[in-house]
Amino acid sequence: MADPQHWLITGASSGIGRLAAERLQQRGHRLTVICRSQERAEQTLGWLSGDSRVLLADLADLDQVEAIDQALLEKDEALDGLLLNAGLQYAGHRQVRWSAQGLELTIAVNHLAHQRLAMDLLPLLLRSAAPRLVITASEVHNPASGGGRVGRPAGLGDLSGLENHSAMVNGEQRFDADKA
């Protein structure tokens, strides 16, 4: 077995995040898991082992993300890996949901919170001999899931855009490299 590593994981209370966390633990690694609620934290503590720990922060509130980042930076423990897995999807909902900062909730949680974690904790990650940054998404790619049924599926269409490959935005057919 390799030397134990320290991993920070979001979205480890269920799904592929939990599976990844369980596998990392089986290999003897120490985990710091961010959970969004006390209920999720207690559930997660039920299966975490060793000196792994749970921190509370709702990724929908970037102030809470910053507080977690600052606490980890003050603790000054190197991280060998960041596994950024938490995500949500409100497919089919007519009402837009907003983060604490007034951002659309999916963007705030799935992207901005993880960007903030990665950028703020980069100094701890770079202290590792072999740092790893892993970002996952578990539903949106799957057209059979709720998240994957949003919008029209990707495709090439009728390829009519190739007929006017040099058309400018204003519709002119002439191509002028100086204006491109």
Residue ranges and their predicted role:
Residues 2-180:
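Rossmann-fold NAD(P)H-dependent dehydrogenase/reductase core
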